[in-house]
Amino acid sequence: SGTTDFYRRIITSEASASTLSLENFXHRVTESINMYEKCFKNETMRKCVYDRSLSLLSGVRLRIGLYWIYLQDWFSVFPKENFYIIKTEDYAKCLKCTFKKVYRFLGLPQLNRTNEAFMESIPKANTRRFKDTKMGKMWKETYELLEKFYQPHNERLVK
């Protein structure tokens, strides 16, 4: 899910890796959500999402999961039919399948077996490092906070 993907990305962030604990992560998430919700009450969502200072102050990169705002900006410049949206979990599940669909969408010739084999040999990027897995899964309470925060944004994304 988006929340799990967010956790993976925050854990792999170099700034976080050495100082993060489950308790620290839960605290940072709570404070960040409060900061963004306060901003959303006083400013436009777009301003809050693009506010680099807010992002740096919050300590947790919540804005990276607010995809619909970024897509809305892209759609205001380019036609929607020029976009092919890929879910991270689909990409992770089957890289080759995803690229076949992208090639088809772009009207490119399908991959040959050599290129398919090469794609399957590429190591996965942005995965949790071994030392970071020692921290374990995020707390259920933290997960629920993030799910609650992202839910309305994910609903807008689906529209």
UniProtKB/Swiss-Prot annotation:
It is a single-pass type II membrane protein. GO terms for cellular component: Golgi membrane. One of its GO terms (molecular function) is N-acetylgalactosamine 4-sulfate 6-O-sulfotransferase activity. The keyword Protein biosynthesis does not apply. It is an enzyme of class 2 (transferase). Belongs to the sulfotransferase 1 family. This is Carbohydrate sulfotransferase 15.
